[in-house]
Amino acid sequence: MVSIRLPDGSVRQYEHPVTVAEVAASIGPGLAKAALGGKIDGELVDTSALIDHDVALAIVTDKDADGLDIIRHSTAHLLAYAVKDLFPEAQVTIGPVIDNGFYYDFSYSRPFTPEDLEKIEKRMQELAKKDEPVSRRVVSRDEAADYFKSIGEKYKAEIIESIPASDDIKLYSHGGFTDLCRGPHVPSTGKLKVFKLMKVAGAYWRGDSKNEQLQRIYGTAWTKKEDQDAYLHMLEEAEKRDHRKLGKQLDLFHMQDESPGMVFWHPRGWTLWQQVEQYMRRRVNEAGYLEIKTPMIMDRSLWEASGHWQNYRDNMFTTESEKRDYAIKPMNCPGHVQVFNHGLRSYRDLPLRYAEFGSCHRNESSGALHGLMRVRGFVQDDAHIFCTEDQFISESIAFNTLAMSVYKDFGFDNVEIKLSLRPDARAGTDEIWDRAEQGLRDALTACGVTWEELPGEGAFYGPKVEYHIKDALGRSWQCGTLQLDMVLPERLGAEFVAEDNSRRRPIMLHRAIVGSMERFLGILIEHHAGAMPAWLAPMQVVVMNIAESQAEYAQSLAQSLQKQGVRVEADLRNEKISYKIREHTLEKVPYLLVVGDKERDAQTVAVRARGGIDLGVMPVDAFSERLRQDVQTFN
């Protein structure tokens, strides 16, 4: 007798072993038709999986997140099937699920063209309509390797040969195609109804640039056409908001091959940067942080003591001078500990909060670089809090309050918080980890926020809180972190004199709110589609005259606003006013002031707000007050 407990708490009993599909059918024909897989005691399995003992079972359908993953994984295999059908000489490699879709890497003698993608997608649709059953068989490693060698699939054979000889291998087949996979997969290809191939890109075999370059075909798959249409619309909007395109259009920055992963900031882009930095500087100063500056280049011995030289060496830029090795800092923390160590610290000095807009460099691979979002040279709004164990909860509460307030000011109202918990390999005792994790939970609870816990995702030296902001398109970006560190203070000899005159290690909290300034500016640009709020806008106001006779008034008006701290310019060119308005509208300037003879004579201005909103004619002082109220919260 096999007892199966369902998610609603009910128990079904069967006199003999049953498959997931048979359980679904016994519940009802609708569920049998909808079933894509199952979850047996939390493990995702195929509908063909046999249940021969008492278990908890959930039937997975396309209404479940796991169901969508199964669909996407199966669609990746359908893609490989179609490619092999159309291009038999192509070699298949790997095809995983990724955010919003999947990809599959192929080795082929020539580049796939857009026309090829159309043919492949059409063939996928034809194969899906055949509704061919998907079967699974388990074989030995050697049998699987021999099979793929026999059909000339050298990459698959290489993958299999890297698996321990004692492991069994799952092979999935539909029609004339067989692939290696952990699964699970849909029961038949007819379940794959909504998909689209997106693009082709280059990729290296096993992610190593020394290996052969492959062709990676990206695709997306969904349960409903409306969902796919919404996703494709979001991609169109994302393309319009692409910070690289807007950076060029708005003359904010550029990048070039002579300095890969580094940014050339133009005047307007640097003005935007300064608004963010000065705002952040004011907020951390108000929160009791002390701003410091640490060297960009430090001796190898310090990085060895911190552990970075041993564990992070490949990502560090290094140099040598006078027979000494140095590293250009990839992070600020060791330098901050040096400042803490410079002098005897008492418990009365704590908490000590050191902040730095620290310039860091990391040797990211050239293929990973992406505009402002992934760079080699960047500045962090970094800070480290040195405190006692009794203080770390209150410090965590204060940081969370500050971070959430900052995100709100920048226009991000939707923030997801994640708490990464202890990994298997870790420093410190279970008792220390219990206190650290519970302390962060208590801090988040006190702040009235909800969070998701990620078991095993913490660093080996402590648990971490992550802040993921959602932009206008619903995309999630991890920006802020609060990382408890139980290792670095000991490695670098940080200590303070406790109340009983003993020497103790401080608790060290690594924290950042925006993270990389470059990346955060890229997120900001895309979130606001380049139309920055007035307090952030590189140029807040442009004053335009209609004719030469108003030039002097327009110039004096701009000078008056400039003295009030407004970022303003006067456009006195001998051009049609409609031309000037259009040009500055494309520059996304928040306020355009137009002056003609009437405005000059009455000492007024005609005001147009961004978006073509006509605010009418008003006295100069009235406009100044409007602008002041627009920006005062943030300045």
Swiss-Prot record:
Q: What class of enzyme is it?
A: ligase
Q: What is its EC number?
A: 6.1.1.3
Q: Which cofactor does it need?
A: Zn(2+)
A single Gene Ontology MF term assigned here is: tRNA binding
List locations, semicolon-separated. Cytoplasm
Alphabetical GO biological process terms:
threonyl-tRNA aminoacylation
Query: Domain named TGS: which ranges?
Result: 1-61
What keywords is this UniProt entry annotated with? Aminoacyl-tRNA synthetase, ATP-binding, Cytoplasm, Ligase, Metal-binding, Nucleotide-binding, Protein biosynthesis, RNA-binding, tRNA-binding, Zinc
| InterPro entries per the UniProt record, alphabetical | aa-tRNA-synt_IIb (IPR002314), aa-tRNA-synth_II (IPR006195), aa-tRNA-synth_II/BPL/LPL (IPR045864), Anticodon-bd (IPR004154), Anticodon-bd_dom_sf (IPR036621), Beta-grasp_dom_sf (IPR012675), TGS (IPR004095), TGS-like (IPR012676)
Which reactions are catalysed by this chain? tRNA(Thr) + L-threonine + ATP = L-threonyl-tRNA(Thr) + AMP + diphosphate + H(+)
Q: Give the cofactor binding note.
A: Binds 1 zinc ion per subunit.
For this protein, the record's Pfam families field holds: HGTP_anticodon, TGS, tRNA-synt_2b, tRNA_SAD
Q: Where is this region: Catalytic?
A: 242-533
Q: Does the keyword Protein biosynthesis apply?
A: yes
Please provide, in alphabetical order, the Gene Ontology terms of the cellular component aspect for this entry: cytosol
DNA-binding is among the record's keywords: no
Residues reported in the UniProt entry to bind Zn(2+): C333, H384, H510
Described purpose of this protein according to its UniProt entry: Catalyzes the attachment of threonine to tRNA(Thr) in a two-step reaction: L-threonine is first activated by ATP to form Thr-AMP and then transferred to the acceptor end of tRNA(Thr). Also edits incorrectly charged L-seryl-tRNA(Thr).
Family, according to the entry, reads as follows: Belongs to the class-II aminoacyl-tRNA synthetase family.
Q: How does it assemble?
A: Homodimer.
- What name has this protein been given in UniProt? Threonine--tRNA ligase
Native organism: Paraburkholderia phymatum (strain DSM 17167 / CIP 108236 / LMG 21445 / STM815)
Q: What is the lineage of its organism?
A: Bacteria, Pseudomonadati, Pseudomonadota, Betaproteobacteria, Burkholderiales
What gene name is listed for this protein? Answer: thrS
